[in-house]
A protein has these predicted regions:
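Acidic (Asp/Glu)-rich catalytic clusters
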Residues: 1-4, 170-174, 199-209
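Aromatic-lined carbohydrate-recognition surfaces of secreted/lumenal glycan-active proteins
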Residues: 5-18, 82-89, 114-162, 209-221
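Substrate-binding cleft/loops of secretory-pathway carbohydrate-active enzymes
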Residues: 138-139, 144-180, 185-197, 224-225
Length: 232
């Protein structure tokens, strides 16, 4: 701040551990481990493809993440809360309706509808995002809340991954103050050219209250991202 810079806290909401499902490797004080050891809360944490995740469909999980964001805003002089692009993991046609939080989906009122699991999962993410936004604004109205989703909109709207409703976020003041898509490709990328992807995001944003910032990865400069050397 003394140098005129804004500082935001970057959070990754659902991931507990990557590359391991061994709960004993977590601290004994880790809530994910405590939840796993209790039959009543065991499904608050899910193992999937070698990693551990908080279950997006559980209210206790949502409360934990919201309170974490609120704690940061209350105790640290940050200008914003910035959520990373990791939401639901990726499924496929054989397990999309049976893996991960499918049990919670089937037990919900939406579980009676064929293929409703996509809407169900998006609903869980929306509930979390809206709750974080409300908590941040209630704590310090001047602190912003934004999300940095993956850059390719088609991937975000897939029925197999993420389950983020970016169109709703971009056109409502109840979810985010800004969206910062990670457009980490060059102008010569074979299917995600920087200018085309950027224009698509700008076209999707219709609310004047939600800003769109383009996320550029400086660390990829000079690497093969589909850009010519002159464009790097």
């Amino acid at each position: 701040h003394a140098n005129g810079m804004k500082i935001e806290a970057w959070i990754n909401p659902y991931r507990v551990a990557a590359g391991s499902t061994n709960y004993s490797r977590l601290s004994s004080k880790n809530l994910a481990r405590k939840w796993h050891n209790n039959k009543k809360t065991r499904r608050n944490v899910l193992a999937y493809r070698g990693s551990l995740y908080y279950n997006p469909a559980k209210a206790q999980v949502r409360e934990l993440i919201v309170n974490g964001a609120k704690e940061i805003v209350q105790n640290y002089d940050v200008d914003g809360i910035h959520m990373d692009d990791y939401f639901y993991p990726t499924f496929n046609s054989s397990n999309v309706n049976s893996a991960f939080d499918a049990k919670e989906y089937k037990a919900s009122t939406m579980g009676k509808h064929k293929n409703g699991i996509v809407a169900f999962r998006r609903q869980q993410v929306n509930a979390l995002v809206k709750a974080i936004h409300s908590a941040v604004k209630a704590t310090k109205p001047n602190v912003t809340f934004g999300i940095s989703p993956a850059g390719n909109i088609d991937n975000l709207t897939s029925k197999y991954s993420y389950y983020v409703d970016v169109n709703k976020w971009l056109n409502s003041h109840d979810y985010v103050d800004y969206i910062c898509p990670q457009i980490y490709w060059g102008f010569k990328h074979p299917y995600a050219k920087f200018d085309r992807v950027t224009k698509r995001w700008m076209k999707a944003a219709k609310s004047k209250k939600v800003k769109v910032y383009i996320g550029i990865a400086v660390y990829r400069a000079g690497h093969n991202t589909g850009a010519s050397s002159s464009e790097r």
